[in-house]
Curated annotation (Swiss-Prot):
InterPro entries: Cry_V, Galactose-bd-like_sf, Pest_crys_dom-III, Pest_crys_N_sf, Pest_cryst_dom_II. This is Pesticidal crystal protein Cry14Aa. Toxic segment of the protein is located in the N-terminus. GO terms for biological process: sporulation resulting in formation of a cellular spore. Coiled coil: none annotated. The gene is cry14Aa. One of its GO terms (molecular function) is signaling receptor binding. It comes from Bacillus thuringiensis subsp. sotto. Promotes colloidosmotic lysis by binding to the midgut epithelial cells of insects. SUPFAM superfamilies: delta-Endotoxin (insectocide), N-terminal domain (SSF56849), Galactose-binding domain-like (SSF49785). The keyword Iron does not apply. Keywords: Sporulation, Toxin, Virulence. Belongs to the delta endotoxin family.
Length: 1186
């Protein structure tokens, strides 16, 4: 909107861009990987472009080098619906590790990347000889694995790798045996090389390299076994040969199961070795050292180990997502930075009070994931009268989505608080104590400390902080961990604190960035169209009365385990997003004898299963006798393996499912619950409409039938061959139009209705009604063309997203049981993120005094807010529409989403699949541009929606009574808007005028004018503005966001120009005393505008700086400009040069024209009294016209 503020063209910065975080870069690259994988399955050709970009990004430090590899491995079981190619995941792994097909160069890059990560996170490095050995080992696996991968591809595709347009084929017995031979040879070679490398130095520094090699070998097994499972019965072996090959395959599967556990134990031996793992002591530095080690090993080794079991293709047959709830820890910050001391850590979650009990023996392994999303952190700050240098945080409040917890040396509730919104990826603090101040700042909140560091800072070595030899300043340097976010804070106190002991100290626990505290399954991957197999840690369940479950540490699972005793009850509620068939299973360890547990499953409040299940002992002997086909890995509390809890051919509808597990007579340990889709989703039809009636497919997009309760899920395709069917369908096509000219749609025809009629036309028999079908399809496409022309929304059927603003986990999917064509799917996002879709219709497209109809079709939804707004949320509804499976397509004038007598097909019901609202437009205001806004937003972290057929169309002119009503709304809205504009203009116009005065021709793009000084810029304060965020979507910029960003960037632009002209480095003192040589008592002072200034406190205090003038000309004039107060002198060169002298009780501005005889000069600032404060100093070359 235009508030009559002076408009400015964009300055040379992208002022509206939101900086892309590491996590966003990861998500984008992971999406590219999935698309490349999908294309690989369709064509047999793997594009390395995305992998090359991902590798380059990881080398640039954008994200952890293993994160994308884990993302790629999750695709191991994915498939293209309708396809037959068994794509080897090892091809993805090879491509990620060696993306440029240059074995030597890529391996060197990989080794370098890993080595840098390990040195950064663990302060460990390989010896040169060991590095060479691991390089040779990884290269050998590359060679042998690539041979097998190529054989698997060639067995299923015609031609060779150089052939264009290769076609899929069924492997022959020769093809199959070639793959077997290549695999046997490759695995034998890998084992030999592995035995050699393991005889060397296998320690912490080598563990990440071993994990890479192990993952590659297991990926090779996965690819080979998956290929054999798919083709062993199809290639045409004789009975004897088939039996031989099946026996060989069984031995290979046994080897893979055994290898997974053996590899896991090798890693755990190194990880837990007392020579490597520090001991948790009573002092702070010992806990920090332990946390550094565990975090480095978790991110670089253990997170990958945790997913090895999911590579076993007999257990994980589809695309997989195993949630990891393990926690890592930052270094402790605050209290007294850089100083060791006896430590006490407090348990934030033991009570709702601000006072808490101690965590026994500082054992951070007792800290586990808190199952909620940290929305924001509020710090309570103590600010005595002594000034800002004496302030410090003394307490905090952690605000979660469903709870809050606090800590303080007194209750922070009701006190002034400083808030930091989530997601928070790092926490750091600085402390400073001297004769003149005693302060602390945490994440920039607290004291304004003038100190600076004179030493470097290492997050992996004592003292875990940078320090100053000049001013007792100390600051932590916790990094922003890739793909991690803070889950909770734990307060600590220590001895050896200088000054006030009330200063806050905190330890932060971190979890994976995309971890959602809500349990959801049935996510549909928009790239692969697969329903994802989901593993949910048991610690995300709950005990009776919603109590947090007791947990024990497990290193190998990516989550803590829940010990389950006799009589215990564990609940887990999860939201299903896709109606299909599922199997539910448990991953557990039972170190005792066989036991039975009770399993009760309810769905949307109704019981669907109640049984007792035997959980077999998982000791080594029991596994070999009772569960010989199972993969297991040995953890701290026993061997973990899988067992089915529930399996059925019925379709689980969407909504909440609750598992209630009741303990038996033996103690067991539950790792996670898994939800496995067992029925594929429909394959895409790729329908495209055009005016010639050719939409690329003659059949409706439905494939098969299933039963959900008493309701039939039909997926045809049906075929109408009776003349009576043709007549009924023809009548329905004609009814779409207002007249036989077919130039205007009937008044009440909707997008959904056109799609339904299209399905019926597509189901007409080609053999019997070829010409009639062609003509009817042409009319249906004409109806779609007219529909698009009248719809004020662009992409109402999501055929384009050009005008839509989409949030996290907002996907455009195609054809399902309920939709013909594209539809929007909003899926749950991690906590503070919001899945949303938003579009604004511009004022210029509207008519005055007109009623508009807003309608749409919802496949299913849960806790989704719909808003339609012009004058202020005229329509604001929460959409909760349960899934109802489609009925068969018939020739009658009925719809397939549900039976007509069902309430969900009644648009007047709150849970209807259809919605239909009206919104009135009064007078038009092009200068304010209110338009019509429509938005959909998930309001709970387990919310979801599938929706399409959205329309906003002109309905009719308003009546006289309606005009009167809308005029009252319009006038009230306009009056408030103009008052707001006037208020903002009054606030901003003086600031804009000040900024205009900085630049030539008042153009913020231009050069700054000669009069501009640092003090000029420091005196311009951009005020706090309203509506910086969008009124409905917090993640979108609000009305005044753009002007605020432009002003800030203009000031930054001016500051940068001034800094470039200034021959004195750090003359603004914004970076403390960097670039200055200090003598005596020199420190930083915080002025009233929060700007930093140089303070010389004694007669003998001074700072100096050497300056070299490039392209020196002794006839060139320079201007020295100083803003200072107190008593002091500023002088260049030797004693004969005239000095600028200050002797004033207030700040004054002085300038002087200077000539130099030599290009190398020395600037000296000297105190001549008890205090000399310099706010800024600059030396600029004068132009000829100055």
């Amino acid at each position: 909107m235009d508030c009559n503020l002076q408009s400015q063209q964009n300055i040379p910065y992208n002022v509206l861009a939101i900086p892309v975080s590491n996590v966003n870069a990861l998500v984008d690259t992971a999406g590219d990987l999935k698309k490349a994988w999908e294309e690989f399955q369709k064509t047999g050709s793997f594009s390395l472009t995305a992998l090359q970009q991902g590798f380059s990004a990881s080398q640039g430090g954008a994200f952890n080098y293993l994160t994308l590899l884990q993302s790629g491995i999750s695709l191991a079981g994915s498939f293209v619906p309708g396809g037959t190619f068994v794509a080897p995941i090892v091809n993805m792994v090879i491509g990620w590790l060696w993306p440029h097909k240059n074995k030597t160069a890529d391996t060197e890059n990989l080794i370098k990347l890993i080595d840098e990560e390990i040195q950064k996170q663990l302060n460990k490095a390989l010896l040169d000889q060991d590095r060479n050995n691991w390089t040779s080992f990884l290269e050998s696996i590359f060679d042998t694995s690539a041979t097998v991968s190529n054989a698997i591809i060639d067995a299923q595709w015609s031609g060779t790798v150089d052939t264009t347009n290769r076609q899929q084929k069924t492997p022959t017995t020769s093809d199959y045996l070639n793959v077997v031979g290549k695999f046997d040879s490759a695995d034998s070679s890998i084992i030999t090389n592995e035995n050699q490398i393991m005889n060397g130095n296998f320690d912490v520094a080598a563990a990440p390299y071993f994990v890479i090699g192990a993952t590659l070998r297991l990926s090779l097994y996965q690819s080979y076994i998956k290929f054999c499972n798919s083709w062993i019965d199809a290639v045409g072996f004789s009975t004897n040969d088939a039996n031989t090959q099946k026996a060989n395959l069984a031995r290979t599967k046994l080897t893979m199961r055994t290898t997974i556990n053996e590899y896991t134990q090798r890693v755990m031996k190194v990880f837990k070795d007392s020579k490597n793992m520090p001991t948790i002591g009573t002092n702070k530095f010992s806990v920090d050292a332990y946390n550094v080690y565990v975090k480095g090993m978790t991110l670089n080794v253990l997170d990958m180990v945790a997913i090895w079991s999911s590579l076993y293709p007999n257990d994980y047959t589809s695309q997989t997502a195993i949630e990891q709830t393990r926690v890592t820890f930052s270094n402790m910050v605050g209290q007294e930075e850089g100083t060791d001391g006896t430590l006490k850590i407090y348990n934030t979650f033991d009570s709702l009070s601000y006072q808490h009990s101690l965590i026994p023996n500082n054992n951070v392994n007792l800290i586990s994931y808190y199952t909620d999303e940290l929305q924001n952190l509020e710090l309570a700050v103590y600010t005595p009268k002594g000034g800002s240098g004496y302030a410090y945080p003394y307490g905090f409040i952690l605000n979660y989505a469903n709870s809050n917890y606090k800590y303080g040396d007194n209750d922070p509730t009701g006190k002034p608080l400083n808030k930091q919104d989530g997601p928070i990826q790092q926490i750091n603090a600085a402390t400073q104590n001297s004769k003149y101040l005693d302060g602390e700042t945490i994440n920039g909140i607290g004291a304004s400390l003038p100190g600076y560091c004179t030493t470097g800072c290492s997050a992996t070595e004592q003292p875990f902080s940078c320090t100053s030899t000049a001013n007792s300043y100390k600051a932590s340097c916790n990094p922003s961990d890739t793909n991690q976010k803070i889950n909770a804070l734990y307060a600590f106190t220590q001895t050896n604190v200088k000054g006030s002991t009330g200063k806050l100290g905190v330890l932060a626990s971190l979890v994976p960035y995309d971890l959602n505290p809500k349990n959801v399954f049935g996510e549909l991957d928009s790239d692969t169209n697969n329903v994802i197999l989901k593993g949910i840690p048991a610690e995300k369940g709950y005990f009776p009365n919603n109590a947090r479950p007791t947990v024990v540490k497990e290193w190998i699972n990516g989550a803590s385990a829940v010990p389950f005793y006799s009589g215990n009850t564990l609940f887990m509620t999860a939201t299903n997003l896709t109606a299909t068939q599922y199997k539910i299973r448990i991953r557990y360890a039972n170190p005792n004898s066989d036991t039975q547990i009770g399993v009760l499953i309810t769905q949307n409040g109704s019981q669907i299963s109640n049984s007792n299940l035997t959980l077999y002992s998982t000791t080594d002997s029991s596994m070999s006798s009772n569960l010989p086909q199972n993969v297991y890995v040995t953890g701290e509390n026993g061997n973990y393996t899988l067992l089915d809890l529930y399996s059925t051919t019925n379709v689980l509808s969407t909504g909440d499912i609750t598992l209630k597990l009741t303990g038996g007579n033996q103690k067991i340990f539950i790792d996670r619950i898994e939800f496995i889709p067992t029925m594929p989703v429909p394959a895409p039809t790729n329908n495209t409409n055009n005016n010639n009636g050719d939409n690329g497919n003659n059949n409706p997009p439905h494939h098969g039938c299933a039963i959900a309760g008493t309701q039939q899920l039909c997926s045809g395709p049906p075929k109408f061959e009776q003349v009576s069917d043709l007549e009924k369908i023809t009548t329905q096509v004609y009814m779409l139009f207002k007249s036989s000219s077919y130039e205007e749609l009937a008044l009440k025809v909707s997008s959904y209705q056109i799609n339904q009629v299209a399905l019926k036309v597509m189901a007409l028999s080609d053999e019997k009604f070829c010409e009639e079908k062609r003509l009817l399809r042409k009319l249906v496409n004409k109806a779609n063309q007219l529909l698009e022309a009248r719809n004020l929304l662009v992409g109402g059927n999501f055929e384009t997203t050009q005008n839509w603003v989409l949030g996290t986990n907002a996907y455009i999917n195609y054809d399902s049981f309920l939709f013909n064509g594209n539809y929007l799917s909003l899926q749950p996002a991690s906590g503070f993120f919001t899945s949303y879709a938003y579009q604004k219709i511009d004022e210029s497209t509207l008519k005055p005094y007109t009623r508009y109809k807003v309608s749409g079709f919802i496949g299913q939804s849960n806790q989704v807010e719909l808003i339609i707004s012009r004058y202020g949320k005229e329509i604001d509804k929460i959409l909760n529409v349960p899934y109802a499976g489609p009925l068969p397509i018939t020739a009658d004038a009925s719809i397939t989403c549900c039976a007509p007598e069902i309430d969900q097909c009644d648009g007047g019901q709150s849970d209807s699949h259809f919605f239909n609202y009206s919104i009135d437009v009064g007078a038009l205001h092009p200068e304010l541009n209110p338009g019509i806004e429509i938005g959909l937003k998930i309001v709970q972290s387990n919310g979801y929606i599938t929706i399409s057929n959205l329309e906003i169309i002109e309905e009719r002119p308003l009546t006289e009574m309606e005009i009167q009503a809308v005029n009252r709304k319009d006038q009230k809205w306009k009056r408030e808007k103009l008052l707001e504009c006037a208020s903002v203009s009054e606030l901003l116009q003086p600031i804009i005028n000040q900024i205009d005065s900085l630049f030539k021709d008042a153009n913020w793009y231009n050069d700054i004018l000669p009069h501009v000084t640092y003090q000029t810029l420091k005196n311009i304060i951009v005020p706090d503005l309203p509506k910086l965020k969008h009124w409905f979507i917090d993640h979108l910029p609000g009305e005044y966001h753009e002007i605020e960003q432009k002003m800030k960037e203009a000031l930054k632009h001016a500051f940068t120009q001034l800094d470039e002209k200034n021959l004195i480095h750090n003359g603004h003192f914004a970076t403390n005393l960097i670039d200055w040589q200090v003598e005596g008592d020199a420190r930083m002072k915080v002025l009233e505008n929060n700007a930093l200034a140089l303070q010389l406190s004694n007669w003998d205090s001074s700072v100096s700086q050497s300056i070299d003038i490039l392209e020196f000309d002794e006839d060139k004039a320079y201007k020295l400009r100083v803003y200072a107060q107190g008593s002091g002198t500023i002088q260049f060169g030797n004693c004969e040069d005239e000095a600028i002298q200050f002797n004033t009780n207030s700040f004054v501005y002085k300038e002087k024209i200077i000539y130099f005889d030599t290009p190398s000069i020395n600037l000296h600032i000297q105190s001549e009294g008890s205090e000399f404060v310099v706010s800024s100093i600059d030396l600029v070359e004068l132009s000829d016209d100055e």
